[in-house]
Curated annotation (Swiss-Prot):
Pfam family, one: NADH_dehy_S2_C
Listed PANTHER family: NADH-UBIQUINONE OXIDOREDUCTASE CHAIN 2
Family annotation (InterPro entries): Complex_I_Subunit_2, NADH_DH_su2_C, NADH_UbQ_OxRdtase_chain2, ND/Mrp_TM
Membrane topology of the entry: Multi-pass membrane protein
Reaction(s) the record says it catalyses: a ubiquinone + NADH + 5 H(+)(in) = a ubiquinol + NAD(+) + 4 H(+)(out)
Encoding gene, per UniProt annotation: MT-ND2
Subcellular location: Mitochondrion inner membrane
Protein name: NADH-ubiquinone oxidoreductase chain 2
Transmembrane residue ranges: 3-23, 25-45, 59-79, 96-116, 122-142, 149-169, 178-198, 201-221, 237-257, 274-294, 325-345
Amino acid sequence: MKPPIFFLIMSTVISGTLIVMTSSHWMLTWIGFEMNMLAIIPILMKKFNPRSMEASTKYFLTQATASMLLMMGIIINLLYSGQWTVPNNPNPMASILMTTALAMKLGLAPFHFWVPEVTQGIPLSSGMILLTWQKIAPLSVLYQISPTINPNLLLPMATLSVLIGGWGGLNQTQLRKILAYSSIAHMGWMTAILLYNPTMMILNLTIYIIMTLTTFMLFMLNSTTTTLSLSQTWNKMPLITSLITMLMLSLGGLPPLSGFMPKWMIIQELTKNEMIIMPTFLAITALLNLYFYMRLTYATALTMFPSTNNMKMKWQFESTKKMTFLPPLIITSTMLLPLTPMISILD
């Protein structure tokens, strides 16, 4: 893709998200979602092959269905209240339709089916945008309408997302699918706390985006997409590979790394709201995520995969990619836990 075209498409993606975030009119919100969806498809198809075309088609069909449900909810709300304002008190049926549509756009269970397949079929750079930037717009709308969301609908989806995000990643060897299931689980954590402390959801989203962004950038720097290729990168980039193992443990939520902080704060907040069963279930299912990340770290750092004598060793020229923001991102992704008291005071 030529740089001017890529710049134009990325500008449209960013503009669509900003329109959704700043709009207080339902029609403008819907238009922002459509701009975002139509502009991201050429980025998903950056490598023109059958797999990326299939992934883009799945993404388009899912997002178009979600947009249709969202518009149905908006129209029902308009007929009920006569207003286009976003944070008004919608009709219960409209609220259910809107929540379902936004859950489909986010990839919450049971509407998670598209996330692993789409992420696996696209390049690492496109997957990075899909699992980070594309989560901002739906979560911003959920944040605005959080007082009117039915908890009997959202909380079961949140707990199911955390369970499926951990369970689905157990049997994976493809790094993109592992990150996709991890994204489903993180979305579950965010929507679980949304109804009780929306500000904490923003904190969780920020930390998730930083960690996922850094992990994808290191995978791109290392040119690795599978567990096998990751285990063979010690000879060419030992420092980057060791940083990847640290980041994966942070994504799994292992203390004392940054990924543990949002989980700790969410469990604490849910307990303050006199909820016992849900934070217990979330903590137990989070161990599934931690298990497959620890298994991946163990396979990368402490074992050698079986190989034949004529198997080619991975090598490459010195990387020419300029990633200026990588060092501060790595520090933030791994060493944020000591700042928890200060962040909790601000919250």
